[in-house]
Amino acid sequence: MVDGRGRFRNGYTANTDDPETYMVHLTAETAPPEYLAFLRSRNIPYLVAGKGRVDLSAMLRKVKEKLRVETIVTSSGGRLSGALIRSSLLDEVNILLSPIVIGGFSTPTLFSSPDLSWPSIMPNKLALMETKTLMNDKVWLRYKVVYD
């Protein structure tokens, strides 16, 4: 969970179901002290990385150094995914395609980020690593992110 300003408080509990997974709340130095107290009161582990916003690069370094984590899996929304790929912090992109079409102007995208603007914001290239056909005609696509 990435929340640099301490806004998300409803219905959140620490992940205790699976000892193989570890959920960490990520926040920034400007998060209100009462928010950090809220996280502690619910035994929700957190890391502070960044001043006004969560510094994703610093966060990944801290997770590796403090928790010895080598692999992070995120099923985040488009904003976090977009920020990670635009910051060159993703190694792989895994996409699960389901055989349904959901349309609409408000439908979320896989990657929400600033519009392309040459030369500062360029498209991210992907190289196909693997495909698998799953049950119910679903397809799993696994890509390596190629940074030039």
Task: Briefly describe each language-model feature range.
Residues 1-148:
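Enzymes that bind and transform nitrogen-containing heteroaromatic metabolites
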